[in-house]
């Protein structure tokens, strides 16, 4: 998992509340168990006018030329609600997104995102709306998300503070998932195992 310290990137927005995981990655694309290859199906029902995904929806924000290459997504409250599919953060990350900014997230989606190196940032409704307004007003608008300083800097230079659990921050800063955490403690685990008694049948 790639570490997340500070990221500056082009921002795109989906001005909708309650964006659920079935919209993020529809159920027909969940057959894979590896994390790659989901980006093309991200927001499939909104991005495409046909089932095959051959006809892009020209009115959907992620299809607009001005947002090509966006790496920060801004949305409204309760982002990631619905089923607990881990494929949702996989699809967002595979598309190239590094951070999602919203007033609130579904709890399971929030945890799944952190576990997969995608930073979910909670800001107030007012702060999120300001970011959306600034991004809409200026093509190429970039936002900086600094996990070390726990700040978000808007295109105009306004700085907003956010909070995240210390353990989640540590894992993201160091690029540690569950396996990485276990490997980081390999010596302690080995010492503990060496102390275990050997039982004979």
Swiss-Prot record:
SUPFAM superfamilies cross-referenced by the UniProt entry: LeuD/IlvD-like
Chain coiled-coil ranges: none
The organism's place on the tree of life at top rank: Bacteria
Matches recorded under Pfam families: Aconitase_C
Key words of the record: Amino-acid biosynthesis, Branched-chain amino acid biosynthesis, Leucine biosynthesis, Lyase
An annotated Gene Ontology molecular function: 3-isopropylmalate dehydratase activity
EC number: 4.2.1.33
Cited CDD domains: IPMI_Swivel (cd01577)
Cellular-component GO terms for this entry: 3-isopropylmalate dehydratase complex
Biological process per Gene Ontology, one example term: L-leucine biosynthetic process
Keyword Lyase: yes
Catalysed conversion reaction: (2R,3S)-3-isopropylmalate = (2S)-2-isopropylmalate
Keyword Manganese: no
Pathway the protein acts in: Amino-acid biosynthesis; L-leucine biosynthesis; L-leucine from 3-methyl-2-oxobutanoate: step 2/4
The family this protein is said to belong to: Belongs to the LeuD family. LeuD type 1 subfamily.
Subunit structure: Heterodimer of LeuC and LeuD.
HAMAP family: LeuD_type1
Function statement: Catalyzes the isomerization between 2-isopropylmalate and 3-isopropylmalate, via the formation of 2-isopropylmaleate.
Protein name: 3-isopropylmalate dehydratase small subunit
Organism: Shewanella sediminis (strain HAW-EB3)
């Amino acid at each position: 998992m790639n570490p997340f310290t500070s990221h500056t990137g082009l921002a795109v927005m989906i001005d909708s509340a309650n964006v659920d995981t079935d919209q993020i990655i529809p159920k027909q694309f969940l057959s894979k168990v590896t994390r790659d290859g989901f980006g093309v199906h991200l927001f499939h029902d909104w991005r495409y006018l046909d089932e095959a995904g051959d006809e892009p929806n020209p009115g959907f924000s992620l299809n607009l030329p001005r947002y090509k290459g966006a790496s920060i997504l801004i949305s409204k409250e309760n982002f990631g609600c619905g089923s607990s599919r881990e494929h949702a953060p996989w699809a967002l990350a595979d598309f190239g997104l590094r951070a999602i900014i919203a007033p609130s997230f579904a709890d399971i989606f929030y945890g799944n995102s952190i576990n997969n190196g995608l930073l979910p940032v909670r800001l107030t409704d007012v702060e999120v709306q300001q970011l959306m307004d600034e991004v809409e007003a200026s093509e190429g608008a970039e936002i900086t998300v600094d996990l070390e300083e726990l700040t978000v800097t808007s295109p105009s230079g306004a700085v907003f503070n956010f909070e995240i659990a210390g353990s989640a921050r540590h894992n993201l800063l160091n690029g540690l998932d569950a396996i990485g955490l276990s490997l980081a403690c390999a010596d302690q685990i080995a010492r503990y195992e060496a102390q275990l008694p050997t039982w004979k049948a």
